[in-house]
């Protein structure tokens, strides 16, 4: 099976606090993987490294590869980082949309990387690009809102627009950082259904950070759980049982309680 994401010996330190400890990880084509862990476990930090939003420590041998291209090596971004980012869709917890633009215009932003510079200066998109944007909105059930200002949408609707933008980008990998953290249960279900649909029907690799273990078990075949910057579990979601759950979360709570008591 083709390896889409390769992480070797990744470490990250923030102000003398080590957030990641020599993490190794391989993710294969077509997988839908959940990154789990308590707050501060390093899951979002790991995800941001995958597309080079942040760089790791200058550790000997550290290396991140995405879609066959080096993203960063020993704390330095690759010079051609834009080439790997061009096919990587990143979905943020806070949507990262332009509120003053319409839904359709926000989705068209996904085409900027493949659009000649002079056309981007005038926000000129071809009829074919606009048609593809409408098709992407149809896929996520948002085509009827195409000409509505994005600021008028609910959080769940905005998150689906962000997914449509990734489809417009023709992403081969989608990295979703807590995409349902601020959503009500029904909106969260729709967003996760949408991510699973494009994973299963388009073959797009999806890596998603989640706090909700039940969603990880329901939607992702593989779980990578982090605990204090270490990979605690990496395997089939069906084998992530109550004992592992308790050890991952309750032991962290005891550490926090002891620290407060001290």
UniProtKB/Swiss-Prot annotation:
User: Assembly and interactions?
Assistant: The complex is composed of two ATP-binding proteins (PhnC), two transmembrane proteins (PhnE) and a solute-binding protein (PhnD).
| Reported function | Part of the ABC transporter complex PhnCDE involved in phosphonates import. Responsible for energy coupling to the transport system.
Name the family the entry cites.
Belongs to the ABC transporter superfamily. Phosphonates importer (TC 3.A.1.9.1) family.
Identify the domain of life.
Answer: Bacteria
Cite the Pfam families for this sequence: ABC_tran (PF00005)
Q: How is the protein disposed in the membrane?
A: Peripheral membrane protein
Protein name stated in the entry: Phosphonates import ATP-binding protein PhnC
Q: Does the keyword GTP-binding apply?
A: no
Q: Lineage, please?
A: Bacteria, Pseudomonadati, Pseudomonadota, Gammaproteobacteria, Enterobacterales
Reaction(s) this enzyme catalyzes, per UniProt: phosphonate(out) + ATP + H2O = phosphonate(in) + ADP + phosphate + H(+)
The ABC transporter domain, residue ranges: 5-253
Task: Look up the record and report any one GO term of the cellular component aspect.
Answer: plasma membrane
Q: Gene3D superfamilies attached here?
A: P-loop containing nucleotide triphosphate hydrolases (3.40.50.300)
Q: Which residues bind ATP?
A: 37-44
Q: Specify the species.
A: Escherichia coli O6:H1 (strain CFT073 / ATCC 700928 / UPEC)
What PROSITE patterns does this protein map onto?
A: ABC_TRANSPORTER_1, ABC_TRANSPORTER_2, PHNC
Which GO MF terms are attached to this record?
ABC-type phosphonate transporter activity; ATP binding; ATP hydrolysis activity
The main location is membrane
What Enzyme Commission number(s) apply to this enzyme? Answer: 7.3.2.2
Please give the SUPFAM superfamilies that the UniProt record associates with this protein. P-loop containing nucleoside triphosphate hydrolases
Subcellular location per UniProt equals:
Cell inner membrane
Q: Which UniProt keywords apply?
A: ATP-binding, Cell inner membrane, Cell membrane, Membrane, Nucleotide-binding, Phosphonate transport, Translocase, Transport
